[in-house]
Amino acid sequence: MQDDPENSKLYDLLNSHLDVHGRSNEEPRQTGDSRSQSSGNTGENEEDIAFASGLNGGTFDSMLEALPDDLYFTDFVSPFTAAATTSVTTKTVKDTTPATNHMDDDIAMFDSLATTQPIDIAASNQQNGEIAQLWDFNVDQFNMTPSNSSGSATISAPNSFTSDIPQYNHGSLGNSVSKSSLFPYNSSTSNSNINQPSINNNSNTNAQSHHSFNIYKLQNNNSSSSAMNITNNNNSNNSNIQHPFLKKSDSIGLSSSNTTNSVRKNSLIKPMSSTSLANFKRAASVSSSISNMEPSGQNKKPLIQCFNCKTFKTPLWRRSPEGNTLCNACGLFQKLHGTMRPLSLKSDVIKKRISKKRAKQTDPNIAQNTPSAPATASTSVTTTNAKPIRSRKKSLQQNSLSRVIPEEIIRDNIGNTNNILNVNRGGYNFNSVPSPVLMNSQSYNSSNANFNGASNANLNSNNLMRHNSNTVTPNFRRSSRRSSTSSNTSSSSKSSSRSVVPILPKPSPNSANSQQFNMNMNLMNTTNNVSAGNSVASSPRIISSANFNSNSPLQQNLLSNSFQRQGMNIPRRKMSRNASYSSSFMAASLQQLHEQQQVDVNSNTNTNSNRQNWNSSNSVSTNSRSSNFVSQKPNFDIFNTPVDSPSVSRPSSRKSHTSLLSQQLQNSESNSFISNHKFNNRLSSDSTSPIKYEADVSAGGKISEDNSTKGSSKESSAIADELDWLKFGI
């Protein structure tokens, strides 16, 4: 807005000239019109000559044609040569510049702007003469806005805004304002100027020199020579300045804001362009002007180079104690070792440290920022990858073991009850397993089908194995843990724990309620096994209370397994131990085994009927073996493995194979299992799993006895031995 006061001052100057000449506002307007049309006075002739020269020159034509907008400019010139108008209103501007279409729109703005400023200016008209000289002098001295002072003073007579702004813009900014149309009111006039073909910067600079020169000449009757000198200087400066502003036409706000300081701002813009990115880009746009190009080029930050290794690229620039610029590597080396980093250590690759991987690495590796770092990183990666691979192998092995045993168990169970096995297979799905509450609520006759779920019914032994492997992988881990705990018992107990022992319904195979109860028991066992299976009391309590005539939870599990009335086997996530996971449970299980052995006689009748199921429920023996572990796991294994899996098929004969607890359970059940043992022996002979062999190995010669135990006496002896062994293990 400095332009406005300047314009007002210039306008005042114009008014002062007008006042000095004593012309009325209307007279200069008329004279201006007549001048624009024809030269009335000698001064007017000079103006017309100037205009004619501009028009003929073509360089100044834009100014002149802007002047049709600037007809007030002609009026403004007239006051110097002939009486000039004190002030030209926008209405007069409209009259004087009917040719400009843009002016009409801008005139409304001019009305507000021009009218308001002339009012302010009118008060200072008395000072105009002094101000004009001061303006010329200041411009002359500082080369600030000579064209502004001269051009604006001359041009701005009628309208401080219309004539003044384009004028000083021509002078200081060149045609920047006319092109950029910084001010909307000027934008119209400047647009009209822009519309003129002769607006070229060079032509403007030259024409400007002529234009302003003529204007000064015409205007400054008092100080024409100074004005001419000023204009020449201004033109020379403006010729340089104009180009950037013309190219910066969109960003001319700075220059336009201060007409007097426009040149100064140009000089300021040069360093700014070097410093700030935006200004630098701006300077690049301005770069056409030599003045801006040179400073911008000079001001570009020189590429920073490491004093030591001469590199240009580093994540962080450092400084040596001497103040030399160093790259990050050299700076750190200097800081740590106090010497310059040898160039032999220089590498083209900037190495980044990965804290997690590097933490495992030794300091020397860290010190070596070179290939060792990536190598160490790769090694750490490989090591980290190796661990999961091992765990995967373990889980796969567990899966394979569980698969093998369940297959045999399922096969035996299939021989007994394919439906039950199918139910168990499907039922093994934990996803399909309803919550214990639901399980309890469901009757097992219906719940067997429901519990198994549609997908379970569809599962065959092969699919079941896949399904079990998919569902049980977390369980295998648990089972592996259990097996590790049960490893005290024997490897066979591990295998038996891995072998799925389906939890069968209550000993009465006929009662759906007992089945439901067994299912509830199984669910409770499953839940207990999952949650508190380790607690000896909890799982046995649930088992004993829930399941059976037989007191021992293991037998109950076994019975439920053996019964599996409608494939009641309730899948347990922790199949390794139905009763509990802890070895302490084994002690309880031993007691329960004795009880079960007693109860087994009772339950054995059930199991005899269920033996075929119980063949799968070798898991019963498995449960007895790993009573802590087996009961759940055998259920799992039964679900996982086909009926044939020997763990299920070995009631007493496999007892040696199974954990001692399971064997004891089998022995206790041996009376009932004698037939079952025969059947189981058949099954065991039919299918032997590595688990059984492990159990046999653990059991020692008992395995052969158990395998040969088609007679109850052998079974009973094996049972006693197993019980002793379990006691010893406990």
Swiss-Prot record:
Predominant location category: nucleus
Classification via SMART domains: ZnF_GATA
Residue span of motif 9aaTAD: 129-137
GO aspect biological process, one term: nitrate assimilation
InterPro entries hit by this protein: Transcription_factor_GATA (IPR039355), Znf_GATA (IPR000679), Znf_NHR/GATA (IPR013088)
CDD domains: ZnF_GATA
Signal sequence residues: none
Comp. bias (Polar residues): 33-43, 252-262
GO molecular function, one term: sequence-specific DNA binding
Keywords associated with the record: Activator, DNA-binding, Metal-binding, Nitrate assimilation, Nucleus, Phosphoprotein, Transcription, Transcription regulation, Zinc, Zinc-finger
Compositional bias per record (Low complexity), positions renumbered to this chain: 224-240, 370-384, 449-470, 482-499, 596-631, 641-651, 658-672
Basic and acidic residues composition bias: residue spans: 18-32
Phosphoserine found at: S251, S267, S285, S469, S552, S562
Renumbered residue ranges of the record's region Disordered: 1-45, 187-208, 224-262, 355-398, 449-516, 593-673, 696-717
GO cellular component: cytosol; nucleus
Function: Positive nitrogen regulatory protein. Required for the activation of transcription of a number of genes (including the allantoin pathway genes) in response to the replacement of glutamine by glutamate as source of nitrogen. Binds the nitrogen upstream activation sequence of GLN1, the gene encoding glutamine synthetase. URE2 may catalytically inactivate GLN3 in response to an increase in the intracellular concentration of glutamine.
More info: Present with 589 molecules/cell in log phase SD medium.
Name assigned to this protein: Nitrogen regulatory protein GLN3
Organism expressing this protein natively: Saccharomyces cerevisiae (strain ATCC 204508 / S288c)
